[in-house]
Amino acid sequence: MVGSDGRSMMIANAGNSIVLDNLWKTYGSFVAVGGVSLSIEAGKFCTILGPSGSGKTTVLMMLAGFSEPLRGNILIDGNDVTRLPPQKRNLGVVFQNYALFPHMTVFDNVAFPLRMRGLHTAEINLKCRQMLDVVELGGFSGRYPKELSGGQQQRVALARALVFEPRVLLMDEPLGALDKRLRAALQVELKALQRRMNVTVVYVTHDQEEALTMADQVVIMNHGKIEQFGTADELYDQPMTEFVAGFMGDTNLIEGVVTGRAADGILRVEHPTGRTILAQNSSSAIGDQVSVSVRPECVSIEAATAPISEEPNSWSGRIANAVSLGDAMRYTIVVGENRPSLQIEMQAKASRRGAHGHRFSPDEAVRLSWNANDARVLPRRKK
């Protein structure tokens, strides 16, 4: 669904709601967006995820029409809108600061885009009442933005963006100013509303939890390019790069060299200590310098009551730190303590009292293991 051949992708995906075809945007010599090609299915919730400066907001601004690409094309429902002004694209937009008119009531804020489109008063009144009911603000139509909570202001902005029935809703960090509890509640509400209205959403955020909670499709950007595109589960369980593995959540990255291939696409990787790791990936070749990604929750931890096994994916170490997460414990384990130059720290996540009813303490000797299908071989990032 992502490719460098923007022209062929545009033809193949003309039925999709949104197609970005080889978009570029520069500021002087700085490349903000470099050759982004992407197709987003109609009715899907697509999150563009990345750190500050990754180009995600620039992509959204080009899609909205607030910024013009240096080259490339933007299609919405098969129509080229690259050079159209924002008001002719029929897109709803919600920003982090909501951009509500402080001198207007809730009703007038929501009615504003309808009045700009020249609708009759009776139709405006009906659409506004219906939309305010949808966002559960039917009794707040006469209030002003300053009289509302942050969550209520966000709902007004959302109602204003949806009241004219846009083809696509664009959202730039819309929950960023809210506290964690309210943010979590509104994530659920927003996803439910998107499904109910069957609107295509493009949602920019740096928050991995928001992407995992709401998105049907996730785009991860870094340095102006797309690192990976897929479902949240695909990106979490099957990252293609070290950056994606780390950005989608905590992970252990263990360096090594591919030394062989086992059955079912499992690779054999040798760590500098001589320990063998088995992990998934069909694209790496023998001799490649790689990193193996293993999520902390996939690492089994038990007391080292017997000599360490020589089996692959079986390591010994000592607890360096133990942190309670409420329903679970996160352990930091130093592995390879007999060879200081090759020591690494690994993370493991276990239930409060461990799989065998034991809660581990700092400096306790432990054994770590994981399944080959829970580990993924990734190309080593250049340093």
Range-by-range predicted roles:
Residues 49-51:
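The feature captures the beta-strand-to-loop junction immediately N-terminal to the Walker
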Residues 45, 84-246:
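ABC ATPase nucleotide-binding domains
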Residues 64:
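Helix-to-loop junction immediately C-terminal to a conserved catalytic motif
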Residues 3, 251, 260-383:
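Non-catalytic connector elements of ABC transporters
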Residues 72-80:
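Conserved ABC transporter NBD signature motif
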Residues 70-73, 123, 223, 255:
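Conserved coupling/switch loops of ABC nucleotide-binding domains, chiefly the family-specific signature
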